[in-house]
A protein has these predicted regions:
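Residues forming the flavin
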Residues: 1-182
Length: 182
């Protein structure tokens, strides 16, 4: 999706984190970065759930890039910004630092094209009510989380999984990291 795999300037958040860690991306060399949320997530046919960590990861990376390079322009295309707990403060800080948030809906997803070594992201900006075009040095995609534990170990340890293959939590609000088995 969104040209992933066709250009080295289109990466996932996991790849961005690795590139920042091993210094293969220098934030000071970037002028414009676009981040797109809910890539292949919250769709009718695939990953029809919110992974609950993508927005936090996006905000963390956007703030890191902005602190490393205050002159960088960052746009975040999002469907719904889902931050939990203290991470909500990251959202507030990001807006205060000048990071631009552009909401999109399922029917009007951003479009991505490649031009030379840049990425062109077009979308509809609901506040101004018009299409926009952004020429970016880097496009970062927030992809959903997939369950990775095979069913056999879950059965062996007696841990229940939900219909999607994730461990079933004891109580999503108060005990989200506790399994049903005590």
């Amino acid at each position: 999706a969104y040209g992933y795999g066709k250009s080295p300037v289109i990466v996932t958040h996991k790849e961005l984190e690795e590139d920042l860690k091993n210094k293969s991306i220098d934030p000071s060399s970037l002028k414009v970065v676009v981040m797109i949320q809910c890539v292949d997530s919250r769709e009718k046919d695939q990953k029809n759930y919110c992974s609950r960590i993508c927005c936090s990861s996006t905000l963390k990376h956007a703030l890191h890039l902005k602190s490393s390079n205050p002159d960088i322009t960052i746009y975040i295309f999002y469907r719904d910004m889902m931050t939990y707990g203290f991470i909500e403060t990251y959202y507030t800080k990001a807006r205060q630092k000048g990071i631009t948030f552009i909401q999109y809906d399922f029917e009007n997803k951003p479009d991505v094209t490649l031009e030379d070594s840049n990425v062109i992201v077009t979308g509809f900006e609901p506040i101004i009510g018009a299409p926009i075009e952004i020429k970016a040095d880097l496009l970062v995609l927030a992809t959903g989380v997939l369950p990775s534990l095979p069913k056999d170990p879950a059965d062996y340890f007696g841990i229940q999984t939900d219909g999607l293959g994730f461990f079933e939590e004891a109580e999503s609000k108060w005990r989200p990291v506790d399994a049903l088995k005590e």
